[in-house]
Amino acid sequence: MRFVKKVKNMKNMISSWLNRLLYKAIMSLKIMDHLDFQMEGCSMTAKIAIVDKPIKADITDVADWFLLKGNMSNKKIQKLCYYAQAWSLTLLDQDIASHSEFEAWVHGLVNRTLYQVYDGYGWQELKITNREETMARMEKLFTPEQVEVLEAVWDTYGEYGADQLEALTHTELPWLEQRTGLGKFESSH
């Protein structure tokens, strides 16, 4: 009986935590025209603004957008860019940027373009050297809807460290499906 009670308590705790996380993610998105959301029932209907503008940004621009928020490791920037791409495809029905394909590497989802750009930095934190110029460039590259997606991704995942984001991506279907048949440390590229 105690075991059943503990399992129910754990289930309720996890359900509550997931509801709060989902609520935070949805409420941080201001690109929705209409939203019916019930916290307890977790039912949601949303009408999303679809963006028909051509993609101007490259995946390295997405990385720069996040780096304006603060210095971070190559691993963390990879994961944030992955989530920006996933959220953009889901909410806007378009890529967040060009060259936005991700592969399931041992340490999570990795974009080959970003990997090539930042490979030489090793474990050093990446940073923006010219903030004003980068900020001006970002204003020209991203639509207001894309900025809302980027802000929502930052608000949801920005506080996590690189290892936490890696662990999170390892629990999600895109990584799991691409890693099917590969050993834990076997290269997929």
Indicate residue ranges for each PLM-predicted region.
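Domain-edge interaction signal
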Residues: 2-6, 12-15, 26-189
